[in-house]
C-alpha cells in the first residue's frame, strides 16, 4: 500500500542538471500566495514552485523518461518537478482532489525528511528521502511537505501523474 522503491530512477544527477538549467531560465511557476497557480486546500495555502512538463525542453523530458520502467512510461500523462526552498511547504491534501487516478513521487534530493503522510488509521509517518527513490501511495492518501528550515538546501521531487 505504502512503499518506498529505491533506485526507481538512476539518472538523478542528469535530471537535476537539466532542472537547474530550467530554474536559471525562470521556468518554475510560483505556487504560493500571489503566484500564478496557487495550491490551497481546506487546511490553507502552500508555498513552493513547480516546473511543469509544458515548460520543459525535450532534452529534460527525454532524460526523465530514460530510466523510468517501460510499463510506467506508456501511461504517465504528466510530469512535474516541485521545488521547496527554505520557508516553503506543501499543505496537507489528497491527490485524488486533483482529478487524476495515480501519483508517484520520486525524490531528486535527500536530507532531513519532510514528506509526511497519514495512513488509513490516521497515523502520521515521515518518509526518509533518498535520491532516485520512489514513494508509492494510494491516491486518496492525505500528505504534506513540512516547512523547509532556513539552514536546509532546497528539495526537489519529481511527480509522475496519471490522469
Please report, for each region that a protein language model flagged, where it lies by residue:
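Conserved short histidine dyad/triad with adjacent acidic residue
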Residues: 80-98
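Alpha-helical and His/Cys-centered functional microenvironments
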Residues: 43, 97, 147
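Short, hydrophobic/aromatic-rich beta-strand segments within well-structured domains
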Residues: 80, 104-106
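Catalytic core of Fe(II)/2-oxoglutarate
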Residues: 106-163
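A short coil-to-beta-strand element that immediately follows conserved catalytic motifs
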Residues: 72-80
Amino acid at each position: 500500500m505504502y512503499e518506498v522503491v529505491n533506485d526507481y530512477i538512476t539518472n538523478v544527477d542528469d535530471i537535476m542538471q537539466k532542472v537547474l538549467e530550467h530554474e536559471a531560465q525562470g521556468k518554475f511557476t510560483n505556487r504560493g500566495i500571489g503566484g500564478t497557480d496557487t495550491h490551497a486546500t481546506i487546511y490553507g495555502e502552500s508555498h513552493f514552485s513547480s516546473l511543469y512538463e509544458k515548460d520543459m525542453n525535450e532534452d529534460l523530458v527525454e532524460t526523465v523518461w530514460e530510466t523510468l520502467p517501460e510499463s510506467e512510461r506508456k501511461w504517465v500523462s504528466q510530469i512535474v518537478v516541485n521545488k521547496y526552498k527554505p520557508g516553503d511547504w506543501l499543505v496537507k491534501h489528497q491527490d485524488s482532489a486533483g482529478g487524476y487516478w495515480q501519483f508517484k513521487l520520486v525524490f531528486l534530493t535527500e536530507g532531513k525528511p519532510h514528506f509526511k503522510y497519514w495512513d488509513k488509521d490516521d497515523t502520521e509517518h515521515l518518509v526518509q528521502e533518498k535520491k532516485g527513490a520512489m514513494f508509492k501511495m494510494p491516491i486518496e492518501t492525505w500528505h504534506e511537505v513540512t516547512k523547509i528550515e532556513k539552514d536546509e538546501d532546497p528539495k526537489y521531487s519529481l511527480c509522475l501523474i496519471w490522469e
